[in-house]
């Protein structure tokens, strides 16, 4: 028993040594290969340069070149000094005029930065990428600063570990190299040095054969366990095993992944269901900023099932032409039956959205079929969280039983098809391609029974053919809930009075500081009211248009009904420190004249980007400053303060470095995030601090995002430098800003 325990203890240690030894060998081999590649490339480039030089020399020999006359004297030029250049060789002396350059004041120091026009969210840096150079004076005053800085990153510094770098190529080579060892080699430490050298030579002789031939069997688990122990940041042993499988699987050229849907515009387009066609769209598209893979919202809101009224989807009762489907017998009755079925169907809230993923061993049918599994909503967006547990699964099963229709996007399948009145004329036998069928299923969830509009969008089918295809697919397309079911009541004046009072109550709870404002995340609690457990209510935020709650939610912000400029506290939006929403505020002009600068609403400047022209020049106070080109009026929007959006913890780590540089561009956005314009930002970052500023900053809610706006505190003339209050403490103000600009005497 004693020997067995000793051997089991020595096994992992031995494998760790092997991992380190093979890793160092592979790294050294990679460096040698890289050096050989550099030498080969250098020789090749050198040869090309020599060949090109020889070609140019031959061309110059054939050309006639006019000789240059050497100036021997400049005495004829008055007020100039001469400078002669002589040589010990047989070259004549050269005399040229000497011109003196006057001293020029140097420009202020500026660190490199990347220009941005909107905020950019970044992840926290848990590893110190480089140790900043502070100068000898800073280190002499505070010798422990570097040590404390490294402690803030838990001692993780980029490049300080000998075995810190491993990419996919080295990982595969390392696993293959470790696979040469036998399972009986765990007690190599007890062997003689001569025997160990012989084994090492045998391994080196077999490495060439190993590289040419693929491994016969999958590597043992102990190999991945040893690699995981040496590189814990690369994942567990199971994760490394899956990664090795993915990297070593041989893929055929041009083969698509098992979960990939062919391009709808390509020759291999297939007829697939709506959720499969829109899976990438729902996964990558951000519904808050209307971009793919946006860099501002890590959480993508799920599509709101409460549909707005849209004139594009309104059904036109007039036929589009003599061949319109409405001339067919039974067409109008069929459309009326669809509308009646939609009105009968109440809107159901989905039980929760998760990122849909198809199993590897299954594929969706090319033709629609009725299936209980397909009624599950798979075209999900990025999830806010993952629910686990038996209780949650029971709830999901109960919700699945209740759900017969998914949402307004018609992602589910209905088992009660609508019967069509038989037509006198037989339907046309038209073949639909996979792309056309998939496009029809995508559009039917938006345009419903507006077959003329769907035909115009498809482009290759008439509205009659679209209508007949819709009748054919009636058994698998669910009736969509009508948009009139959730229409709010018409008593808007009383509702807005209550909301104005509600806004004042919320505003009284906040003192205007960004430290008491929390970041907004859309709430998503199906069939649950927005009570004390709602995340929006907990954070004292209003429910926005991105939330999944009902439009009758008591915490939902309704917008304003102003007919003025929305620049006083009489406007609910202005009172709540938020810009007017063009989707909610329909009477103040926020939704009108989007391309025009003459907008009646003055509370939508940040979202429109109505910034002023700013000029960058040396400041009269310190370093660089920003100046206004055109005059602005009091309370007029000047620019948005843009930069990287980082967490409060990351801001604390960066701030300690910025304090030593005595230069900081950190700006509190809310209680969760900070805007840092040090590395990325716009020109307003150069606005200096003043206790008597001509601008002020205000954090506003703009379409669900907190953004920082810089406004004029008074009327500013052309060419004035912009200042705003950094809200320094008295000690910090004396420490960082020792110069105050001179006040102009009127």
Swiss-Prot record:
Changing residue 45 to A: Abrogates interaction with EED. It comes from Mus musculus. The gene is Ezh2. Residues 182-195 have a biased composition (Acidic residues). Induction: Repressed by the microRNA (miRNA) miR-26a. Residues 503-605 form the CXC domain. Glycans are attached at residue 75. Residues 612-727 form the SET domain. This is Histone-lysine N-methyltransferase EZH2.
């Amino acid at each position: 028993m004693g020997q067995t325990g000793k051997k089991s203890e020595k096994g992992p240690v031995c494998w760790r040594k092997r991992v380190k030894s093979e890793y160092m060998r592979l790294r050294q081999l990679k460096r040698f290969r890289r050096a050989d590649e550099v030498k080969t490339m250098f020789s090749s480039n050198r040869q090309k340069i020599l060949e090109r030089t020889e070609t140019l020399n031959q061309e110059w020999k054939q050309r006639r070149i006019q000789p240059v006359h050497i100036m021997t004297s400049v005495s004829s030029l008055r007020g100039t000094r001469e400078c002669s250049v002589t040589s010990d060789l047989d070259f004549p002396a050269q005399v040229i005029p000497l011109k003196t350059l006057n001293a020029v004041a140097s420009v202020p120091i500026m660190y490199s930065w990347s220009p941005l026009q909107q905020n950019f969210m970044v992840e926290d840096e848990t590893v110190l990428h480089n140790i900043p150079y502070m100068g000898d004076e800073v280190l002499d005053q505070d010798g422990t600063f570097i040590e404390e800085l490294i402690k803030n990153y838990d001692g993780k510094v980029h490049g300080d570990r000998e075995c810190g770098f491993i990419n996919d190529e080295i990982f595969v080579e390392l696993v293959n190299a470790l696979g040469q060892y036998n399972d009986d080699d765990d007690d190599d430490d007890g062997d003689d040095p001569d025997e160990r050298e012989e084994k090492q030579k045998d391994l080196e002789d077999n490495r060439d054969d190993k590289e040419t031939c693929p491994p016969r069997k999958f590597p043992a688990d102990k190999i991945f366990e040893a690699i995981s122990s040496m590189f814990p940041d690369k994942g567990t042993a199971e994760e490394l095993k899956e990664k090795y499988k993915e990297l070593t699987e041989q893929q055929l050229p041009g083969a698509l992944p098992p979960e990939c849907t062919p391009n709808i515009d390509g020759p291999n387009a297939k007829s697939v269901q709506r959720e499969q066609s829109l899976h990438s769209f729902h996964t990558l598209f951000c519904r808050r900023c209307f971009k793919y893979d946006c860099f501002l919202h890590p959480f993508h809101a799920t599509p709101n099932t409460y549909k707005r009224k849209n004139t594009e989807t309104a059904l036109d009762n007039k036929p589009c032409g003599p061949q319109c489907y409405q001339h067919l017998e039974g067409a109008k009755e069929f459309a009326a039956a669809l509308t009646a079925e939609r009105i009968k169907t109440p809107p159901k809230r989905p039980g929760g959205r998760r990122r849909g993923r198809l199993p590897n061993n299954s594929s969706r049918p090319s033709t629609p079929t009725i299936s209980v599994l397909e009624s599950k909503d798979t075209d999900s967006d990025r999830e806010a969280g993952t629910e686990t547990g038996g209780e949650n699964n029971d709830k999901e099963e109960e919700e699945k039983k209740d759900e017969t229709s998914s949402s307004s996007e018609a992602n589910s399948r209905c088992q009660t098809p609508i019967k069509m009145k038989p037509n006198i004329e037989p339907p046309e036998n038209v073949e639909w391609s996979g792309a056309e069928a998939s496009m029809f299923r995508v559009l039917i969830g938006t345009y419903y029974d507006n077959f003329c509009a769907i035909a115009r969008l498809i482009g290759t089918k008439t509205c009659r053919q679209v209508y007949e295809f819709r009748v054919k697919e009636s058994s698998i397309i669910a009736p969509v809930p009508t948009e009139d079911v959730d229409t709010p009541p018409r008593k808007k004046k009383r509702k807005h009075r209550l909301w104005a009072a509600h806004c004042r109550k919320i505003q009284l709870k906040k003192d205007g500081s960004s430290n008491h404002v929390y970041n907004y995340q859309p709430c998503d609690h199906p069939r649950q009211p927005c009570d004390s457990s709602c995340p929006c209510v907990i954070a004292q935020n209003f429910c926005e248009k991105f939330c999944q709650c009902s439009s009758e939610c008591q915490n939902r912000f309704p917008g304003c009904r102003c007919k003025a400029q929305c620049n006083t506290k009489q406007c609910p939006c202005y009172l709540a420190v938020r810009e007017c929403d063009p989707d909610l505020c329909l009477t103040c002009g926020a939704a009108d004249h989007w391309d025009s600068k003459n907008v009646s609403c003055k509370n939508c400047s940040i979202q429109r980007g109505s910034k002023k022209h700013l000029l960058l020049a040396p400041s009269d106070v310190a370093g660089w400053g920003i100046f206004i080109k055109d005059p602005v009026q009091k309370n007029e929007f000047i620019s948005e303060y843009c930069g990287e959006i980082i967490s409060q913890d990351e801001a604390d780590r960066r701030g300690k470095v910025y304090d030593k540089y005595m230069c900081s561009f950190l700006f509190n956005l809310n209680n969760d995030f900070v805007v840092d314009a040090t590395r990325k930002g716009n020109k307003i970052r150069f606005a200096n601090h003043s206790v008597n500023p001509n601008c002020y900053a205000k954090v506003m809610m703009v379409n669900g995002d907190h953004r920082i706006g810089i406004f004029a505190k008074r009327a500013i003339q052309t060419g004035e430098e912009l200042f705003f209050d950094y809200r320094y403490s008295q000690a910090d103000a004396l420490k960082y800003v020792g110069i105050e600009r001179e006040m102009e005497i009127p």
